[in-house]
């Protein structure tokens, strides 16, 4: 079959809720993927940061295969031998009393919202049905009805109403706006991305997260960090919140928690918060399944043992430095932290970020635009300096043709 045949079949039988680049991939290894015709590409999207450990990392795949042959699912109706090991390992890894295992990022966000509201009623003493959670404009936390109810992006929420109440929307990177919102006595939580990924890798001012964290604690409001995309080494530290020395009251993780091998997400909190939910009040058939547990342990061990946070920091500095040296009128701004980066483009002669990504594909590197004019560059954290310089050369040469 030709690439267009695969695409035609997918479009015929699949819902049209994505607009992929016209490339059909068959195999991946490390920082590379190969299409059905055998052409190799640098993967500079990494499954929206889920593939931080690289494609098909041998240690993670080995863990997957060993567990798949032993036991894959029991549901939480019974105990599994590996689940307690996973919970202990990850709680100690990130420094929390408890975790609640889920599968997807959106599920984890929903779980955190429920947990925050429950804490607000049971611990803070907010009147029934009055709890409010503060969120930021231009956020992206998922696609469920409740999550899009706090979105400010029409492509996420338009014509999907009625919407879930209970959210206060404020501008991102604005401490004064948060201070004003927290005057509401019914405010129980502040949900924030340490860096807004889908918005175009928007990095807040230094000190913003710390100031927000301090405000939350002054007002007895939970600080909830959505580190699904920024966490697990992506920004050059284990968590992006580590840059400001803050420990979220509720931490949400996903994506790279499994190294892109299986859907695994988790919500972390201490006992005072987590134990407000009792048996039967929240759950997931697949959440914490043995396969996911084994894979997640291996994925985190890879991050630790291969020093991927440190490599992300070093390679990110290299990438941004080289990008800023490119003299091209289409490059308006380079921003990011670690290996979560973006190039903000300026249209030229009718050419946009989409056209640049098509040209990058032809030259052996795949990346994807966000918001039409921004290209997100997020390679696997295992990338070497030699590989990074080769990829930068592709990007430089591609821009030179525009």
Where are these regions (language model features)?
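Conserved N-terminal phosphate-binding loop of PLP-dependent enzymes in the Aspartate aminotransferase
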Residues: 1-402
